[in-house]
Amino acid sequence: MKLQLSPLEIRVIGVLIEKEITTPDQYPLSLNALSNGCNQKSNREPVMGLTDAVVQETVDQLIKKHLVRSHSGFGSRVSKYQHRFFTAEFGALALSPQELAVMCELMLRGPQTPGELRGRAERMARFTDVEHVERTLNDLMERGEPLVARLPRHPGKREARYAHLIGDEAFPIEEFMATAGTGSADQGGHDRIGALERTVAELQTQVAALEEIVESLIDSAGKRT
């Protein structure tokens, strides 16, 4: 089955896979939790700022494609969502824990080297070494419908990067990452500046409070003398 998903659909499914593995007690996810996962600043490339409405629309599209299902617990009025991706339900698409972890990281962070994947996917599945990651990537490339491709090595780089192949052809991986990555870097810069400004403001407040305490102590000492 040839999968052609948009970047937003890939992000939603990647988040559902990640949270199922790393926080099973909180899975399936509510719309709010899913939106937070999509916009998470750590382990994401690019960083996104999706509204609940956009995430809901994306989820609805995935439900129509039978890749996500809505789940409501007994007595609960809040719908929760779980993926049906890479499971036994899809037969040939069922993956091992290591394959699933690698695919999830590629979906959440885009093209990566085996070394990067080992460090980042370790939270979801155990890899004995980088060679283990490379074998997993080869298995994903050698399937009847390849799920991963090896990208041309960049000049001066020792390791080649690998990318998933489940994106819509209308959204080339490299082009999307290059465009979105710039926005991500800008956003990251704004976030860091904002954090520094908040820290400075907090320090200024603390200094002002200390100055008041010192003045109070001086006044008290003066009165005693």
Question: Where would I find each of the regions flagged by the language model?
Answer:
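Helical coiled-coil/dimerization "stalks"
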Residues: 120-123, 152-166, 208-225
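Positively charged, polyanion-binding regions of nucleic-acid-associated proteins
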Residues: 6-28, 93-111, 137, 142
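Amphipathic alpha-helical oligomerization/assembly segments
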Residues: 183-224
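Intrinsically disordered, low-complexity serine/threonine- and proline-rich regulatory segments
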Residues: 1-14, 21-25, 59-94
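Short acidic, hydrophobic short linear motifs in intrinsically disordered regions
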Residues: 23-47, 111-127
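Extended, charged alpha-helical interaction scaffolds
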Residues: 88, 95-137, 144-148, 153-155
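A short, conserved structural fragment
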Residues: 56-74, 137-154
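Short, amphipathic alpha-helical interaction segments positioned at domain boundaries
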Residues: 77-116, 160-191, 195
